[in-house]
């Protein structure tokens, strides 16, 4: 069994979070395309930028989770404010509640606060506040030696 077959089997038959990494040209995108075609799980593919989302045939993180472009403080008050201001349509909430597998491509570009916010949103909408990512399986893909998280001007001043 090849490494890709083993990873595919692991995604299909477990609910564990997985980090898939490799240098450019090692088959990460090919693996993702196969997974999208063959995996029966309810899946969403996201990426931190529009270009990365297009390449992964997904959407941006901010689009799926209806997040504003800002830094997110890991406090209870900040989360309460985020959920109070969040205007997520019922169909988008349904997508998050039915989600079994969340694929984050180009994870090296995702800031830690954004990953923490994804966790909080999934816990909130799945009504599973004590389970990481609301029980949704996470597959993060990327090369940590490539691109680092992008910061906007306001974030760099903090």
Q: What kind of region is each of these model predictions?
A:
Residues 1-158:
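Conserved ATP-binding/catalytic motifs of P-loop helicase motor domains
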């Amino acid at each position: 069994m090849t490494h890709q077959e083993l990873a595919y089997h692991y995604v299909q038959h477990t609910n564990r979070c997985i980090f898939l990494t490799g240098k450019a040209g090692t088959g990460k995108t090919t693996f993702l395309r196969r997974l999208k075609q063959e995996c029966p799980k309810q899946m969403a593919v996201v990426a931190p930028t529009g270009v990365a989302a297009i390449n992964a045939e997904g959407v941006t993180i901010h689009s799926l989770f209806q997040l504003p472009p800002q830094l997110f403080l890991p406090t209870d008050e900040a989360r309460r404010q985020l959920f109070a201001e969040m205007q997520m349509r019922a169909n988008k909430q349904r997508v998050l509640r039915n989600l079994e597998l969340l694929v984050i491509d180009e994870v090296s570009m995702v800031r830690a606060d954004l990953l923490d916010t994804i966790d909080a949103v999934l816990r909130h909408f799945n009504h599973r506040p004590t389970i990481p990512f609301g029980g949704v399986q996470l597959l993060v893909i990327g090369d940590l030696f490539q691109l680092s998280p992008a910061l906007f001007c306001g974030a760099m001043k903090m």
